[in-house]
Amino acid sequence: MNPLVTLIIYITLISGTIITMTSSHWLTVWMGLEMNMFAIIPLIMKTHTPRAIEATTKYFLIQASASMLLLMAATINFMEFGQWTVIDMPSPIASTIILAAIMMKLGMAPFHFWVPEVTQGTLLSTSLIILTWQKLAPLSILYQIYPSMNPKIILASAMLSIMIGGWGGLNQTQLRKIMAYSSIAHMGWMSAILIYNPSLMLLNLTLYIIFTITMFTILIHCMATSNKTLSMMWNNTPILMMTLLLTLLSMGGLPPLSGFVPKWLIINEMITNNNITISLTMAMLALLNLYFYMRLIYSSSLTLFPSSNNMKFKWKMNNTPKLPFLPTLTIISILMLPITPMMFIFE
């Protein structure tokens, strides 16, 4: 792709998200979402393969439908109450429609079907953008309007997302689909705590983005797209492989690592608000995610796929690529638990 065209695409992508996050009028919010959608489409179909074209079509149809629902709900709210502001959403019909539109854009259940297919059909770098940057604009809208939303609908979708994010990843061997189902589960955790403590949602979002960037950075540099290719990384880049495995454990919420922090704080907050049954169910469903992370770690580190080369390690290791920001991301992804008591803002 032409470097100038690529620059224009990324500028449009960033501008669309910033416009949506800083707008207080529904029309400018919708305009920012449209800019965001049209900027990501050329990146998804960069490879010009049938799978990429299929992923682009699915992404366009889902996102365009969600934008249409959002604009329709904003129009209904204006016709009933004469309000175009984002925060003021007194119409229950309009608020429910907007919530459905945001769930479609975030890939939350029951509108989650497009996320694994689109993520699998494109490049690793584009999958990273879809699972991180593309979540910011819809989450910023949800953050502003959650007081007007029905909390029962949000909690039901959150529980369903956590369940599907765990069950959907059990049979997967493609790493991009595993990360997609992990994203669905993380969106469920964020939306569940939003109605009780929005600051915890921001903490969870920050850590989720750091985990995902760390994972995809390693996968991109090792060109690993499946469980089989991941098992061959021990021969080439054992240090990066060890970092990847620790990041996977952290994403699963294993206690000594950073990923345990948001789950611990979220469950504590929900128990404080007398939602013991919901928090217990969420904790049990989180074990599904931890299970397929552990299975991925076992199959990639403790087993070897059949190969014509009987050597377990190469006689000469490849140089680890220079990734100046990866050590910082890795430390945050793994070793942030000791500073948790300093996070008094999230209490």
From Swiss-Prot:
Subunit structure, briefly?
A: Core subunit of respiratory chain NADH dehydrogenase (Complex I) which is composed of 45 different subunits. Interacts with TMEM242.
Cellular location(s): Mitochondrion inner membrane
Q: Which InterPro entries match?
A: Complex_I_Subunit_2, NADH_DH_su2_C, NADH_UbQ_OxRdtase_chain2, ND/Mrp_TM
Instruction: Give the catalytic activity.
Output: a ubiquinone + NADH + 5 H(+)(in) = a ubiquinol + NAD(+) + 4 H(+)(out)
The entry's cellular-component GO terms read: mitochondrial inner membrane
* Single GO BP term: mitochondrial electron transport, NADH to ubiquinone
Entry keyword Cell membrane: no
**Could you tell me what this protein is called?**
NADH-ubiquinone oxidoreductase chain 2
- What is the role of the protein in this entry? Core subunit of the mitochondrial membrane respiratory chain NADH dehydrogenase (Complex I) that is believed to belong to the minimal assembly required for catalysis. Complex I functions in the transfer of electrons from NADH to the respiratory chain. The immediate electron acceptor for the enzyme is believed to be ubiquinone.
Q: Name one GO molecular function term.
A: NADH dehydrogenase (ubiquinone) activity
- UniProtKB keywords: Electron transport, Membrane, Mitochondrion, Mitochondrion inner membrane, NAD, Respiratory chain, Translocase, Transmembrane, Transmembrane helix, Transport, Ubiquinone
Q: Which residues cross the membrane?
A: 1-21, 25-45, 59-79, 96-116, 123-143, 153-173, 178-198, 200-220, 239-259, 278-298, 325-345
Q: Which Pfam families match?
A: NADH_dehy_S2_C (PF06444), Proton_antipo_M (PF00361)
Principal location:
mitochondrion
As recorded in UniProt, its EC number(s) are: 7.1.1.2
What does the sequence similarity comment in the record state about its family? Belongs to the complex I subunit 2 family.
